[in-house]
């Protein structure tokens, strides 16, 4: 885990934090019922895990998906603040629920430890960014946050400015026999970010191939602004 806050923090709810996306993980072992009643969660649990960040939504959701798979926690809320510190994308608020505080802490740790991987196919340039995600088996966080079908392969193909995402999605669907789940755009589902995002499902190999095809054309288009988009971590979609 890439911690930049003091690991000996006296705040008992603190689990860890990462410079990647300015992401912080916390656990409330027994949440106040009055607060729980006001939270926008799909199911009430006494123990809550929280993953919150300034930059990135898809990477944190996919990282949290691994935390869900590794524990008995359930994803009960995903929200998309318009953020990226003034960029074209999102931050994210993810809340998970369960009965065991130790399980919640483990899920948050797994998510924080996966950020370097799930940010591997985020490519940035001054003019915009691309994000690609893939999993052979989606779980509850990808389902609630991105509309994935639990237990099936899932891919996310996203471009900023949003028009690049439209072309990326078209290329992806023409490349492999996959099923489109949704297309979100600035006024339709992205919390007004300047992104076009296609989500897909289908055979694992086909989904991977489609995501890679979208990435290829997206990199070519974004580079037309005069700067090669770069990723800060090694690509994991190969």
From Swiss-Prot:
Localization of this protein: Bacterial microcompartment
**Assembly mode:** Homotrimerizes to form a pseudohexamer with a central pore 7.5 Angstroms wide and 22 Angstroms long; the pore channel in the crystal binds up to 4 glycerol molecules. A disulfide bond forms in the pore, it is not clear if this is an artifact. The trimers pack into an array.
Give the protein name, as stated in the record.
Bacterial microcompartment shell protein PduB
Q: Which GO BP annotation is one of this protein's?
A: propanediol catabolic process
Describe the function of this protein: One of the major shell proteins of the bacterial microcompartment (BMC) dedicated to 1,2-propanediol (1,2-PD) degradation. Probably involved in a propanediol fermentation/reuterin formation pathway.
GO cellular component entries: bacterial microcompartment
- Specify the pathway: Polyol metabolism; 1,2-propanediol degradation
Q: Which family does it belong to?
A: Belongs to the EutL/PduB family.
* Gene3D superfamilies documented for this protein: 3.30.70.1710
Which superkingdom is the protein from?
A: Bacteria
Read off the Pfam families from this record: BMC
Q: Which UniProt keywords apply?
A: Bacterial microcompartment, Disulfide bond
**Limits of the BMC circularly permuted domain:** 14-125, 126-225
Q: What organism is the protein native to?
A: Limosilactobacillus reuteri (strain DSM 20016) (Lactobacillus reuteri)
GO molecular function terms here? structural molecule activity
**Keyword Methyltransferase applies:** no
Where is this chain primarily localised?
Answer: other
* Disulfide bond annotation, renumbered to this chain: 158-197
- SMART domains cross-referenced by the UniProt entry: BMC
